[in-house]
């Protein structure tokens, strides 16, 4: 299979080609020495980034201030009102109201809430000073919770489909007593609640139609990505291609994780210019790809306690960045082990797969990808129009760099 079919986001093609051409023969020390060189010259050929030459992997922009603890506290303070809005519509059906409240508490209020907080932070960065009223900040927080509800919806469905064990350090929702397959119906309660809140709080706003279309588009695209993810698992080795992975990542992760929160804030801030939305989307989809590659890496090599869930990609035979690169770089004996062990639930076989990942120096390859991707996206941000504050996008990018959970 030609390399161009096995690369990561085309953003990092030349970097990955350099390392993949080692064919697994170079020891980790040689790889590390290569990483220390400042003489690399790569050409980026991302579908979202104009091709340009990069002289070095150093000299990134100054990292700006990020979301504060006060922002997180204020965001959480709105959550009880969100739950009340959702439960008051059915005052005569106490069982349903109780279930919705429990659903929200268990599946929406936890986690890092990065997507929801991104809506608020983005609005503060994008809106003119006169629009930063307490009422508008509160509305941005409500819309942030709408994004978090979509996240909760996808989490419940994904955990059920993957038969995951834990999420955020607790048993997955479907594993709670009395839930089981009902989790699919419960997830729909969260999804419908998201659109209920949009209607309740935004139907008289100029941006309401754009906002609903944005959420529906994110929902549709993410569903496409989730579905393709489910049907792309090993042992069908023809599914382990980077073209397929790029599609899954773009649709399953990038749209609702990065594009949706920022585009929501843009509409709320009165930014309708199609070119500005195109530029923002271009950067945000690249961040989403970067985010998913990180997730794939952390699923295998991350700290389970810090992440809050047990990695399952190997036993599920997922189409992941690590798996694709491993099959590309593996020697015939290594490939034979991967084909016999990848996608099985036996602990000793899972360990064999992970051992081969290490033999192939995939942690070092990943860190090289991360360093180069961070710098290339930084340069793309620096090319954005003045109507898009660079600090906003640099902050989001910096939150990604080197994350451990």
From Swiss-Prot:
Domain of life: Eukaryota
PANTHER family, per database record: FARNESYL PYROPHOSPHATE SYNTHASE, FARNESYL-PYROPHOSPHATE SYNTHETASE
GO CC annotation, single: cytoplasm
Entry keyword set: Isoprene biosynthesis, Magnesium, Metal-binding, Transferase
Gene3D superfamilies in the cross-refs: Farnesyl Diphosphate Synthase
Positions that bind Mg(2+) 2: 158, 162
Enzyme Commission number(s): 2.5.1.10
Domain remark text: The Asp-Asp-Xaa-Xaa-Asp/Glu (DDXXD/E) motif is important for the catalytic activity, presumably through binding to Mg(2+).
Enzyme class at the top of the EC tree: transferase
Pathway listed: Pheromone biosynthesis
Catalytic function, reaction form: isopentenyl diphosphate + (2E)-geranyl diphosphate = (2E,6E)-farnesyl diphosphate + diphosphate
Pfam families given in the database record: polyprenyl_synt
The name this protein goes by in its record: Farnesyl pyrophosphate synthase
InterPro entries: FPS1-like (IPR039702), Isoprenoid_synthase_dom_sf (IPR008949), Polyprenyl_synt (IPR000092), Polyprenyl_synt_CS (IPR033749)
